[in-house]
Amino acid sequence: LFAADCANIYLEAIMSIRPVKKLIKSKPTMEGAGVHLRRAFGFGNTSDYDPFLLLDDFRNDVPEDYLAGFPWHPHRGIETITYVLAGTVEHGDSMGNRGAIAAGDVQWMTAGSGIIHQEMPKGDPTGRMHGFQLWANLPSALKMTPPRYQEVKSEEVPQITDDDGTHVRLVCGSFWGKKGPVEGIAADPVYIDVSVAPGQRKSLPVETTRHAFAYVFAGSGKFCNASGPLAVPTEGVGWLETVPPSEADNRSLILFDSGDEVTVQAGDDGIRFLLVSGKPLQEPVAWYGPIVMNTQEQLRQAFTELEKGT
């Protein structure tokens, strides 16, 4: 065995591998003024993903499917994390901020007490647009915090390459001794973009106290020692097929159970995925559209204030 393989086996022997709890295929939907995208999770069982609420994969080569964008709309009580891989997202808000999120960039917006903004995607020279938007819930004590942005350019995102060639872009949190550029986030999340070479097996630490999920957007692989068909609940992965999937491929979301590490065995084409974890808030969720509060009364109050312009 190579030294890296021996090290991985040793680490797995002393750590607890997180089993796969659920495998989900992201589902096509439309948002904004008619943007075609895929939703990995959202508007469902929030407790499994707490403190996260929603993950959208906006990936398209047809400009007509995304150029209408996301015109002016409100948010309150959440944080939105936009990570762009191709193309650009131009944005503006009710506080007078204007800017653009280009390939490799990250924008972390804390909506807090309320903000109205717009996000308008523009493709790269080939017409391609690709990115992700993740929503993170704010704890009750910070629901009405003043809105703010953290904008990170691609060159500011730490990149780590392990001895076996595994490559990580560190969007947020601490990982492998490095610290990401986004700070002061209530859920203390770790958000990484991971690339593993073909056939390579890799173990990645995740704190036991966190909820964690992965989202595959290139290649395929087996997570957490899955040796056969995944005997876990699946959604959107071929209801008419008699044999459940044995690995996670493009546009698959993997929700993990408890443990302190995630393992992946990359397929023949390698694998690239987001790995996201955060500390659960364990608070009530009252959610309607772009506004997330703790009670129905708070939700009604938010929409009343929005209608009055206050």
Regions found by a protein language model. Name each.
Residues F2-T310:
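Jelly-roll (double-stranded beta-helix
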